[in-house]
Amino acid sequence: MRSSLAPGIWLLRAFSRDSWYRGLILLLTFLIYTCYHMSRKPISIVKSQLHQNCSELERPDNNSNSTTWCYWAPFDQDNYSQLLGGVDDAFLIAYAVGMFISGIFGERLPLRYYLFAGMLLSGIFTSLFGLGYYWNIHQLWYYVLVQIFNGLAQTTGWPSVVTCIGNWFGKGKRGFIMGIWNSHTSVGNILGSLIAGIWVDSAWGLSFIVPGVVIAVMGLISFFFLVEYPEDVNCTPPQHHSWCLESSDEGVLWHYLHCPFIFLQGVMEFSLCLLFAKLVSYTFLFWLPLYIVNVAHFGSKEAGDLSTLFDVGGIIGGILAGIISDYTNGRATTCCVMLIVAAPLLFLYNSVGQNGISSSIVMLIICGALVNGPYALITTAVSADLGTHKSLRGNAKALSTVTAIIDGTGSIGAALGPLLAGLISPTGWNNVFYMLISSDVLACLFLSRLVYKEIQVLELEGLLGHSILGAPPNPTFCVNHSLPLGAAGEPETNL
């Protein structure tokens, strides 16, 4: 008598060959960018160790300096906040500048080779920062130079993984899929914090070396297993533009095809919004553990562990933003609402968040969700929507450039945030939070035009009783042959 089909084989047969490959790509790109973010996080955990309160520690008998013996030069000066901010900005400015160039290379080079080289270099430069501990290096230029090269190497990651995802997944439920997928940012931050926290008090060099080795190994795995296009393994390519009207007016398409990507409708607004949203997110990324140490008076490891709750909230916020934007067809509106709600809650966290461990946990999770939700949505679903725009005529490689433009502009904010925090924090942490609140409000204002258009479309759909042609999440992205060109060369609409 034959036995029934083995459960494992039944599971394998339950999904198509295309589904298994898509699952592999989703998992692999998730792990790839998790490693990128994991390798960025240790500096925020180690900051409190580079300049700590020596009076709370037991001083060695052979050390006569009772006030600065535990500092790590060159961060033993009174302007240590500015020096640490400068180290952050060396990475972030290089990242912002390199991001605009990275998209161009990403279009022309095989993503598998490009990612492998970038991850290997990122691992080397991350480890070199930690080796400064073992080599007893106390020159500021060394750490700044390592951060610059690391920032340039890290620009290989984001355009590549978003392009790969865009090649494999269509627009259906893109916000939900990418909301889950984009949790790699927060998962990487959490892992980076926990790994760095293991050695921060004993040998902080390992806080950098271990993540550096991990990202290099992951680069090797991506070299062997990453598939850039579904066609490379005889899988069915996704349908990106089934929702869009087929245009008979070649003039409209020709106009868009020959315009710089920055003038594609929505790119400018979302880029500027991301600039301020990322300013807030990266200020928390690089300065939250030190804020907790200074205000709540936790140890370095405890502050690092507590700061991971902000990223836990980021995972929740990214998924919620994706689900809501898919359901409402309103990417811009979803982002704007979350940003506006985040502003007063940031003020509340600074005011009462450190009164007790319970209030701190709750506020960190909520603030993390509201701050990182819009950031996650813009850098994933919105970038993919714009990069697979109908006017690009299926040019999937353009997705790398569009993604680089949006994330590169956002990275300018990522560089400004930690720099401003380093300059402002000596005047009081309250002023830092006022800066963050103002940035959230400005981010929302840049989306106001798109929000207005989305609301008009929703009202029109309500009058008609159905969705307008299965409209995309932002209907202004779609080229409609019935819309004449305006004075600026853009399709006019009376919506």
Tell what function each PLM region has.
Residues 107-119, 326-340:
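Cytoplasmic membrane-interface "Motif A"-like loop-to-helix N-cap segments
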Residues 181-233:
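Helix-loop-helix hairpin linking two adjacent transmembrane segments in secondary transporters
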Residues 120-137, 340-354:
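C-terminal ends and interior cores of transmembrane alpha-helices
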